[in-house]
Amino acid sequence: MITVRAPATSANLGSGFDVFGVALDRPADVIRVERAERTTIEITGAGSQYIPTDPNSNTVGAVVDALDAPAHIEIDKGVRPSSGLGSSAASAAGAAVALNELYDRGLSRAELVPIAAEGEAVVSGTAHADNVAPSILGGFTIATADRVEHVDTEIP
């Protein structure tokens, strides 16, 4: 079993709204994955009763499909849904990192960003990296439609 922590994020930063993103220290989702014949999702924690566990309706289902990595996935929600802190992005980002490791796909963190962004399309209708990029890469990121940059800077 692989366990990862995926931090909350903010991508609502002034003139960089939905472009600039920053990872936060707290809260965070904890995602545990183990290989399985078919994908199942179990969710506990903040607002879990409002989140679908059907892989076709959950952000992590798209990540599983993109990585061809069926698994039993446990998500302990620390990032409350509809809080404006990238709840769905944290789950998708954490699943991408954990499944990449579990299945030894060898993808870099940067290569996982567009995969996790596909998970965002499940809940928002559009694949976007504004929240998944900082959740995966940490720190401050700039995400446009065709590019993501990680900015190495101290965040106060």
Each language-model region and where it sits:
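FAD-binding core of FAD-dependent oxidoreductases
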Residues: 7-12, 16-23, 82-92, 122-139
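ATP-dependent small-molecule kinase catalytic core of the GHMP/sugar-kinase superfamily
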Residues: 109-156
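Phosphate-handling active-site elements
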Residues: 36-38, 69-72, 99-115, 149
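DPxDG-like acidic metal-binding loop motif
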Residues: 85-109, 114, 136-138
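Electropositive phosphate-/nucleotide-binding environments in soluble metabolic enzymes
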Residues: 10, 53-61, 89, 93, ...
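Predominant activation on well-ordered alpha-helical scaffold segments within soluble catalytic domains
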Residues: 28-30, 61-65, 93-100, 113, ...
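ATP-binding N-lobe of GHMP and related small-molecule kinases
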Residues: 1-83
